[in-house]
Amino acid sequence: MKVVVAIDSLKGSLSSLEAGEAVSEGIHKVFPRAEVTVRPLADGGEGTVEALTLGMNGRLEKVIVTGPFGRHVEAIYGILEKSKTAIMEMSAAAGITLVDEQERNPLNTTTYGVGEMIKDAIDKGCRHFIMGIGGSATNDGGVGMLQALGYGILDKEGKQVSFGAKGLKEIDRITDDSVILELKECSFRVACDVTNTLCGEQGCSAIFGPQKGATPDMIEQMDKWLAHYARLTGEKYPKADRNQAGTGAAGGLGFAFLSYTNAVLESGIKIILEETRLEEYVKAADLVVTGEGRLDAQTVMGKAPIGVAEIAKKYGKKVIAFSGCVTEDAVECNNHGIDAYFPILRSVVSLEEAMDSKNARKNMVETVEQVFRLIKIYEQ
């Protein structure tokens, strides 16, 4: 029996690879000779760096960068040496989890550290980037990142504008004569699952500003300043289009990537499935196992397990999913390629107990074992 396991992390409990190894252990308790291949899985959000880097035999790098408020923070990203690929999450340098709730103010938060991470990876030889941009604390249009990469986002005195969204109103001109030379050799696959534009009622300020600490007055101001920035960008780079879907991602960071770098915005799960070459493994499998922390109606809206199931169905493979918990509306998963799903909780416990990594691992191994015992009965 050949089984391919690609399971997303159970957030707060098991990483993608830890969950996958637990599944493998459960299978081998029943089928000791089974060929089980564990592949990393993520959707471009939290956990992507660890899952892809470790799952593809890369290495994790630590670098000190400028945090959202200008204070130094330690950011971690991954490098795949063979393909000169860097795997990053912008939240490592400019994420909302780095900002205390009472401190949140997008007028002051910057993406400068994101640019520093990119520069560090370029200095280490990377030319291909996989970039997750969820969970941002910023609304600076990616200006901070661009400044760190050598772009001049200048005020009337020829000085770099201030950090944060407040700096957008200061922009007088944009220069690129000091951009790091290697940037033109780099390509970026940006994991982006939002379609919001840069400005307007569905723009980043209006939709995501409140969760970053913006007041109604701030939202109105930031939207005008971003429009000003977009106009100047368009004069410098005609390809810039503030109305393109995804330009409002991460407080306008999507706009900066599309306008100033060789970047494409793509579904996070699409990037991960392609970069890990999961399809090659699924082709040769007898059975595919996937899952995530919680299976519900949202799972069918482009979450990682459904991406795995779609590939499996392309080759007529059966799919089993395991998850920390399952809601009543998870039945929709059966209509989207998951043949059967199982929660791993084995008794009534507190949330803390359920999420304990030792308990989660034990529950996964034991649940998988029992499901595969049933498969063995059927095979006999």
List the model feature ranges, each with a label.
Residues 1-133, 137-380:
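N-terminal loops that bind phosphate or other acidic moieties
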